[in-house]
Amino acid sequence: MDLDLVLITGMSGSGKSVALHALEDAGYYCVDNLPPELLTAFIALQHEQQATRVAIAMDVRSGVSLPIVPQQLEALRQDGVSLRSLFLDATTDALLRRYSETRRRHPLSRQEGRNDVPEQERVLVQAIELERELLADLRDGADVIDTSLIRPAQLQSYIKALISAPQSSALTLVFESFAFKRGVPLDADYVFDVRMLPNPHYVPALRPLTGRDAPVVEWLREHDDVARMYDDIEQFLSRWLDALARDHRSYVTVAIGCTGGQHRSVFLVEQLARAFGTRWVALKRHRELDAG
């Protein structure tokens, strides 16, 4: 079955509609909130119509039908469907902020006309926690994208970059820099802490620059600890990536964090993406730089 299928799931308020619009712009036929009971028949219909690119969004509104989805996805893979499952996630604080800004109601929220703000937030937190429990199995079987700190336009660009990765590649690597002070990315498969490395922040001439700028690159390359850290990460990934590919992983996110997400982590992400890009599809994300 020559069909490229992308399944979008995730937390309410995490950006699923934005992701679906990005896929639509990329030429996918998109369906939002398809009931799981109709998935197999829908895919069979797309095959009859010789569709080649289809994207489906599912979420917690599917309710009691959600547990059947993982088995359905495995059956589709066995039938030869090229399937990529993406789960959009965000921190509870980020979701609370978005609901506060949009004043939309969470699909699992039972608040009816409550005017007490603390009580509204308490009920919303309960709804978010329940949703996490209901979607746990779907999250475990998907490639997770943390949208907590990225804008809609950035999410659209990132989704398009992911789906444009060659299908012939066994694995797509995503190298992501971040600042520990703003939290560890939820989508990280591996996290490396490089805060112990020499910090260009304390060099006045380098402070306003980033790990992509030549003066910072040259300064970091002069320090042996930086080279040793790079070698250790490179050797670890080289040892295990083939095993991850054999385990049918589509994406692996390697997050590298420093204090501000501006110099050391950015430098290492750039270097590692360049090195691994010779064999694998390697994408880069600089969370703090991209956030402006």
From Swiss-Prot:
GO molecular function per UniProt: ATP binding; GTP binding
InterPro entries xref list: P-loop_NTPase (IPR027417), RapZ-like (IPR005337), RapZ-like_N (IPR053930), RapZ_C (IPR053931)
Pfam families associated with the record: PapZ_C, RapZ-like_N
Transmembrane regions listed in the UniProt entry: none
Signal peptide bounds: none
UniProt entry keywords in alphabetical sequence: ATP-binding, GTP-binding, Nucleotide-binding
Stored SUPFAM superfamilies: P-loop containing nucleoside triphosphate hydrolases
Binding site for ATP: 10-17
UniProt binding sites for GTP: 59-62
Physiological role: Displays ATPase and GTPase activities.
Similarity annotation: Belongs to the RapZ-like family.
Protein name according to UniProt: Nucleotide-binding protein Vapar_4338
Annotated organism of origin: Variovorax paradoxus (strain S110)
